[in-house]
């Protein structure tokens, strides 16, 4: 699939991945907080 993407799309894709990886711990704690609020 990588050959079909142009460089701009590839860059956008890697930026998305980088942001997700960087914010993974934040995502996990947000999800946990949402569930804890629902349980109260």
From Swiss-Prot:
Give a short account of what the protein does: RNA replication. The central part of this protein possibly functions as an ATP-binding helicase.
Q: What is the name attached to this protein's record? A: RNA replication protein
Q: Which E.C. number(s) belong to this protein?
A: 2.7.7.48, 3.6.4.13
The entry lists its GO molecular-function terms as: ATP binding; ATP hydrolysis activity; RNA helicase activity; RNA-directed RNA polymerase activity
Keyword terms: ATP-binding, Helicase, Hydrolase, Multifunctional enzyme, Nucleotide-binding, Nucleotidyltransferase, RNA-directed RNA polymerase, Transferase, Viral RNA replication
Annotated S-S bridges: none
Reactions catalysed, semicolon-separated, are: RNA(n) + a ribonucleoside 5'-triphosphate = RNA(n+1) + diphosphate; ATP + H2O = ADP + phosphate + H(+)
Q: Which lineage?
A: Viruses, Riboviria, Orthornavirae, Kitrinoviricota, Alsuviricetes
What the record says about family reads: Belongs to the potexviruses/carlaviruses RNA replication protein family.
Which source organism does the UniProt entry give? Lily symptomless virus (LSV)
């Amino acid at each position: 699939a990588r050959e079909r993407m142009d460089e701009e799309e590839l860059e956008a894709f890697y930026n998305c991945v980088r942001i997700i990886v960087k914010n993974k711990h934040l995502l996990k704690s947000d999800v946990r907080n949402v569930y804890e609020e629902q349980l109260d």
